[in-house]
Regions:
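C-terminal tail/sorting-segment detector
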Residues: 586-605
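Acidic Gly/Asp/Thr-rich repetitive segments characteristic of extracellular carbohydrate-active
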Residues: 24-69, 504, 572-579
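Extracellular beta-rich repeat passengers
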Residues: 215-220, 229, 241-462
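Extracellular beta-strand/beta-solenoid scaffold signature
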Residues: 103-107, 128-138, 153-161, 182-196, ...
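Right-handed parallel beta-helix
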Residues: 88-93, 112-123, 140-153, 165-184, ...
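Extracellular calcium-associated, cysteine-rich motifs in secreted modular proteins
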Residues: 463-552
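Extracellular beta-strand-rich solenoid/capping regions of secreted or surface-exposed proteins
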Residues: 59-65, 76-92, 99-118, 123-142, ...
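Residue-level detector of functionally pivotal "anchor" positions at catalytic/ligand-binding pockets or at interdomain
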Residues: 549-575
Length: 605
């Protein structure tokens, strides 16, 4: 190699290193997990089968990092035990063929520095029941971003993430917790506990829950891991209360009986431009029949249909008993731009502080509500006032907590955007499609077999939930990726790469800014339309950078339309008989899109 080439290579390496310092996880990654690096530059690992474990399995692929996970197959992976994802992993669910990847039966836990995209985790009670059985959860980690994932069917909470650093959950669906699947405490049906030390929850769909939709965690557990936060040097928090900063915006809550509440122990929470829509379970009241809590129709609206949040005071019963210094404290809130809609169609924009209620234990001064702060944990930068001999801080914040880089829509626009794009929407399954139609029409197709409450289900069978035996599968044809670098041959050829040289996947030749490897450019291209469509029409937009690429003919599973518009897929035998699920051999697949377009093709199972 001559000196000129050496200097050119060194310059390229330096440019990439500088770019990586502030490179988004992918174009459209936003919030406090925006700059997670995952497995970038790591080993490319293919998932080649739907087995629970062993060579080619998803479990084997994620057991250690630094790795980038791509998929040669699609369908349901029937887990046989809880799955823990190693540190420094990127999971590119969008690289799977139709119908995408669903994980079932056990809990999935991410690790430090994880990027997880376009994946479905639908746990269920069929194989395992325990009181901690979330579909997914994690705490005490640094650097996690979930993008366009679908979570459902949990025994405890659907998706709980708190006491993590630099976290984002964006464009996900969190719905249909199981109310009476066998939890020792009886009826559960919870959405999630959300919090963190710079944590973002934006553009998510939260639906069909009995409670915790979501519950804000606050600083009640006294976690001190905030010193590992990537932004600690910027903020220099003195304690966990100051470090607890949560941004909750542009989410849609539908038929969630216990909407937002919590925040005990202190912290800062933004609740901005969310849409709260009551559902059919809000027209019921609870009663007990044969020792089981059930819902019965009353024809009256429940009183909490327009609640924005309930501010919770920390006590010995809801907080860590080893941290009494947080007792009597609440979080502080910035609340703006939120819309409510009742079951009778009454819409109230900017409900905001008129929709806030409070636990007992707060203080009032000049018609303002205050939280106790006896130990001055909020710090001298926050004005304190002595009320009844107790040092207190105002609960209402005039300035929002840190938001990170974030796109913001109005609440009305967020409602439309979330319904069109949230969840694993590249190949939206019938479950997410149903959620969105129910939210749009104010209905619930199913009810709990025990509770009898519309939308508030008890078991997976209540909604005829799919399994590995009833859900379609898919695989890549031979010759799709000759060099096994994660990029299809046709795409490599169209973009000037070598389909016989695996090393070019992890170089930066396609991205003129040096942000993304060629493999990342390919993977991001698969969902670029979805990301751009979701972020369009914003009141506050992020100027996202998308590297240029060329689309080869015939590589898309669908024609060039937004795959998130897919609303229904049905299968037929070759003689035209409607099938409940694809059969072994050749099937005719019929795809119906929201714009009325119908496409058919043949698929092999």
């Amino acid at each position: 190699m001559n000196n000129k080439k050496i200097l050119t290579s060194m310059a390229a390496a330096l440019m990439s290193a500088a770019a990586l310092a502030q490179t988004p996880a992918f174009p459209g990654a936003e919030g406090h997990g925006r700059y997670v690096t995952g497995g970038r530059d790591g080993k490319v690992v293919h998932v080649t089968n739907l087995n629970d474990s062993g060579t080619g399995s998803f479990r084997e692929a994620v057991k250690s990092g630094k790795r980038i996970i791509v998929f040669d197959v699609a369908g349901v992976i029937a887990l046989k035990s809880d799955l823990k994802i190693a540190d420094n992993i990127t999971i590119l669910g969008q690289t799977a063929p139709l119908p995408g990847i669903t994980l079932r039966y056990f809990t999935v836990q991410p690790g430090n520095n994880n990027i997880i995209r376009f994946l479905r985790i639908r746990r269920g009670e069929e194989k395992n029941i325990n009181d901690g059985a979330d579909a997914t959860w994690q705490r005490n980690k640094t650097g996690i971003i979930f993008d366009h994932c679908s979570f459902s069917w949990s025994i405890d909470e659907v998706a709980s993430f708190y006491d993590n650093n630099n976290f984002t959950m964006q464009w996900c669906t969190v719905a249909e917790s199981l109310t009476n699947p066998g939890h020792s405490k009886g009826a559960h049906g919870y959405g999630g506990i959300w919090g963190g030390k710079l944590a973002s929850f934006h553009h998510n769909f939260i639906g069909h829950l009995m409670n915790r939709g979501p519950r804000f965690n606050g600083a009640r557990y006294g976690w001190t891991g905030y010193t590992s936060n990537k932004n600690y040097s910027t903020y220099q928090w003195k304690n966990t209360v100051q470090a607890e900063n949560v941004d909750f915006r542009n989410c849609v809550m539908y038929n969630a009986q216990g909407t937002c509440y919590g925040g005990p122990g202190g912290g800062q929470i933004n609740i901005v431009n969310n849409y709260y829509k009551a559902g059919p379970s809000h027209s019921l009241k609870s009663t007990t029949q044969n020792g089981i809590k059930v819902d019965v129709s009353t024809g009256k609206e429940r009183g909490n249909q327009e609640r924005i949040t309930l501010v919770t005071v920390s006590t010995s019963s809801n907080s860590d008993k080893n941290h009494p210094e947080f007792y009597e404290m609440t979080s502080r809130y910035f609340i703006n731009g939120n819309t409510t809609e009742t079951t009778k169609g009454s819409v109230t924009k900017n409900k905001d502080w008129k929709g806030v209620s409070y636990d007992k234990g707060t203080y009032t001064y000049n018609n303002e509500i205050y939280s106790a702060d006896k130990k001055n944990l909020y710090g001298d930068a926050v004005e304190h006032k002595t009320i009844n001999g107790v040092s207190c801080v105002k609960i209402k914040m005039d300035v929002p907590a840190p938001t990170g880089v974030i796109t913001t829509h109005t609440a009305d626009e967020a409602f439309s955007k979330v319904l069109a794009n949230a969840g694993a929407s590249l190949f939206r399954d019938e479950i997410d499609a149903r959620y969105m139609e129910e939210a749009k029409t104010g209905t619930a197709q199913y009810k709990g077999s025990i509770t009898q409450s519309p939308g508030i289900i008890d078991k997976v069978s209540d909604v005829n939930g799919y399994t590995e035996k009833t859900f379609a599968t898919g695989s890549r044809p031979k010759g799709f990726d000759t060099d096994n670098d994660g990029i299809p041959d046709d795409w490599e050829t169209a973009n000037g790469l070598n389909p016989n040289d695996a090393s070019d996947a992890l170089t930066y030749s396609l991205d003129e800014k040096g942000y993304y490897t060629n493999l990342e450019v390919y993977a991001n291209s698969l969902v670029e339309d979805i990301m751009k469509t979701g972020n369009a029409d914003a009141t506050k937009a992020v100027d996202e950078y998308y590297p240029a690429w060329k689309n080869p003919t015939g590589i898309s599973d669908y024609p060039v339309i937004n795959p998130g518009e897919l609303v229904k897929v049905t299968y037929y035998s070759l003689d035209g008989t409607l099938l409940s699920a694809p059969q072994t051999g050749i099937n005719i697949r019929k795809m119906v899109f929201r714009n009325g377009k119908v496409l058919t093709d043949k698929v092999i199972k």
